[in-house]
Amino acid sequence: MKNSLIKYSALALISAFTMTSCASSKSADNTNLPIDILDRPADESSKKYDEANLDKLKSIIESEIAKEKCTSSSDWAFAPMGAKACGGPVSYIAYPKKIETSILTRIENYTQTMSEFNKKYSITSDCMMIAEPSGIRCQGEKAVLIY
């Protein structure tokens, strides 16, 4: 009996320590912790902010296009995308004709934003003209530009 009393007392003591040690502290000081990037105030005058905005616009365009499968090249077209500092597009991108109106608006917005970025930060480029594709072919359900 004395032995079981010691076992139960030890078990109760260990349980109490476990419960109190795992409890979260509500009064923790979070001022020294790093701020999540989404919670940080946007510094709209910084180059990094503008680069991130360009990347976001480009990824929106690419993800919208990636939703569509290429089964017939006649259902696809291509457009110039981006703006080199000394003129001309950065690249060409294939897009499905069925979303032509919305995607061309996004591509034009991206190109205009890149042109403004180039002027704002005095960006220089290689000034090489990018060859315009001669067509599109479907490969693995993805549109591939033909040069």
Range-by-range predicted roles:
Residues G135-I146:
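Short, low-complexity, Pro/Ser/Thr/Gly-rich segments in the mature regions of secreted, periplasmic
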Residues A23-T31:
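Bacterial lipoprotein signal-peptidase II cleavage site
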Residues G82-I103:
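Iron-sulfur (Fe-S) cluster-binding segments and ferredoxin-like electron-carrier domains
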Residues M19-S21:
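C-terminal motif of bacterial Sec signal peptides marking the signal peptidase cleavage site
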Residues K2-S9:
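Bacterial N-terminal signal peptides that target proteins for export
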